[in-house]
Amino acid sequence: MTRMRSLAVLVLLGVARVAAADDAVLFEARAGVATAGAAALSWSPDAALVWVENDESPGPLGVAGRWSYLYYSEATDQARVYSVRDGRILAAENLDMKFDAPPVADDWIDSGRALSAAEAAQGDAAKKAPRGALRAMVLARGTMDATEPDRTTWTLVYSTPGAPSTFVVVDAASAKVLRTWRG
């Protein structure tokens, strides 16, 4: 669990690497799962999806031009990440770190619905204190909900120049906002 949280912090702090989507076809996160999943199963027959994150700036509908899908093989105790853009894999590489990585639940809501839930919950608070620009959307299990560590969640990260980032955690099954904080 500690390794997974460390990975979450590293990834969420690395949102500065997010680039513009240029002319890529924008798509919600779930649309790339079949492509990445087929490659992951050829890499390891027991590969399980453990992490999804935008690789390029997410748009206002929860879409991005490129998404990363991290798979973990319990049999080999290895993780491999696939970056999907325009329906094909642009990059695939093994991660050289060891961590416990529980698979995300199968019934997760897509990125657009997660963003809608986060935006709706922010409502009046957003009018008083702007959230800034959406920089990252991360789907994972067991990283951002201490009360229910088995829960799959979306974590949305907004950045504002000169202010701490805003984090919004959305239950990936019910689309309910679980918590929001700045930090």
How would you describe each model-predicted region?
Residues 1-8:
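Bacterial N-terminal signal peptides that target proteins for export
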Residues 9-13:
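Gram-negative bacterial Sec-dependent N-terminal signal peptides
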Residues 15-18:
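N-terminal signal peptide c-region/cleavage motif recognized by signal peptidases
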Residues 20-183:
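Long, terminal "pre-/pro-" and other extracytoplasmic accessory regions
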